[in-house]
Amino acid sequence: MKKKISQAIIKFFKNENLIIDESKLIIEKSKNFGDYSSNVALIFAKQNKIDSLKLAQTIKNQLLSENLNLEKIEIAPPGFINFFISKNEYANIVSEIIQKGENFGRYSLQKKINLEFVSANPTGFLHLGHLRGAVIGDILANILEFSGNFVFREYYINDFGSQIDRLVGSVFSRYQQIFKKFALPEEAYLGEDIIWCAQKFFQIYANKFENSSLDDLETYKIFREKSIEIFLDEIKADLANLSIKFDVFSSESELFRTEKVQKNLANLPFVYKKEEAIWLKTSKFGDQKDRVLVKKNGEFTYFSSDIAYHFEKINSNFKPDFLINIWGADHIGYVDRMKAALKTVNLNQKLDILLYQLVKLFKNGQEFKMSKRMGKTFTIKDLLELVDQDAIRYFISERSYNSLVEFDIGLAAKISLQNPLFLIQYAHARASKLLANSTIVPEKILKFEAENETILISKLKQFEEIVLKITKNYKINLLNKYLLELANLFNSFYSNSKIIGNQNQNSLLSLTKAVQIVLKNGLKLLGIKAKERI
């Protein structure tokens, strides 16, 4: 309805040759002044040299002449327009939801999107920071696909450079400690996951490398490849335990092996040489300063391979319309330089970067600290032992990606209406139980008049708006908030309405069915089970 009203107003302005900025046209949900209200006449009266009340009245007359299923339109000084939906429209909404079922809320946007997320270094287990990026990426991909887009989910494996050298040195040292005293490198990773990896290595190779040295290239190669493989397998297992999937795992080292880094940089404009290093003039395109691509010793920087990686994605067979990268907030310094690099070849419009904030984990009022360097990392494996997958996905996604998440393990595990996820699943289970023991007669005319019914139906219709909004601003938490509001409205309706035995029973059961459908559709987008019973 909101969309219909907006389109009708825009059509009116254009037919009357009046000035309107569509981006400033706002149709708001109203509690006290009809179902929707707008100040469109106030905003554009001066530009069109018309009295705002007169303009509002003219808009009213035009919209009432169109088939918008409005019961009435009221004007309030100095020019507000209040819209009241026809009771027939509420019945139409419920019928539409039931008819469309799992397809209610879908769009057909038809964009091809490359979505890169998680992309954790294969140097240990996934921790809570990685978890947030994983959940955000997976849910966003679900919603983008639900909206009719084609989404290619990609994980970029950072398996090249100094962090891999540190991994090899750390695992090799822990492996040697199985046989004898052996000093750790100064920059060693200290987590228990490194000890675990060394033990895995021992299970495969026994004492084969007891007297070996990393100075031996073959020994280094085996420790490098096997350590990466062991951790990458665990990363994939953790993601699978959260029902998070990818279409491809792309390797940074593979870009170098196939010389794609070199080839992509060879065609890059705005490159120059200074102090025996090769630089990219990113300062010309919004970056704070120019960036080094190749150091004076001939070593490529991480930035150079990252540029090549983005070019490879853009020029892949998938041919995405745009890219979305989901990075931790600690990557903020890379945003301007990456966008500047794409601007050098006029590709800036193809990249959106979301920076998500940290996760703080609380249990019994105490916060867990996370530091891989100090061996105190709290991992996804640890969390899955305390709360289930559904709770993790809900509580990690319930805040905007650019806000801190405080994850309360106690609340997440609580079987109580204080737990927002339990409350939502409880509403779905209530609806399911009622419908399982009742029959809806599809031929009967639906009728809704009570205020708690019409409010609930209006909330159901908002599901479409929420889905579309998330495809534009990527704030998946809007879905959590919406489902909680819908569940609260339904629970109140259920508790305060006599449904079975009511003379309007068929309509109320149909409304319950519509609620069940929307809750299930929303939970599915979050990757959460819609429980039939609790």
From Swiss-Prot:
Domain of life where this protein originates: Bacteria
Keywords, in A-Z order: Aminoacyl-tRNA synthetase, ATP-binding, Cytoplasm, Ligase, Nucleotide-binding, Protein biosynthesis
Enzymatic class: ligase
Catalytic activity line of the entry: tRNA(Arg) + L-arginine + ATP = L-arginyl-tRNA(Arg) + AMP + diphosphate
UniProt subcellular location: Cytoplasm
Gene3D superfamilies per record: Arginyl tRNA synthetase N-terminal domain (3.30.1360.70), HUPs (3.40.50.620), Isoleucyl-tRNA Synthetase, Domain 1 (1.10.730.10)
HAMAP family according to UniProt: Arg_tRNA_synth
Name this protein carries in UniProt: Arginine--tRNA ligase
Species whose genome carries this gene: Mesomycoplasma hyopneumoniae (strain J / ATCC 25934 / NCTC 10110) (Mycoplasma hyopneumoniae)
